[in-house]
Amino acid sequence: MLRQVLALRGALTPATRAQYAAVVGGNILSREDAWQRSVEFLFERLAVRWEIAGTEPITRQKELLARFRFASVEERRWIRETLRAHLAEHFPDMEAP
């Protein structure tokens, strides 16, 4: 896999945490959908910079989200692992996707 660096925020507002809890709870008929939405929600709220293989870092929110949606299966797995580790360190009270 290419060398990647994802910079994430270290704070979430109480309102954002409440929104995330609602997303994680999601549609009880589709746990997979709720899981996918929770990963995208966290990425959208936490990602501030993404450097891929030494290229110019992506820092604009719209571009970050567009690149996330275009990510390969391997990149999405790496993003999930990165988000889980970040939640464990900075937000241990939040449920990881």
Tell where the protein language model's regions lie, with residue ranges.
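Short, surface-exposed, charged amphipathic helix/loop patches that serve as local interaction elements
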Residues: L2-P97
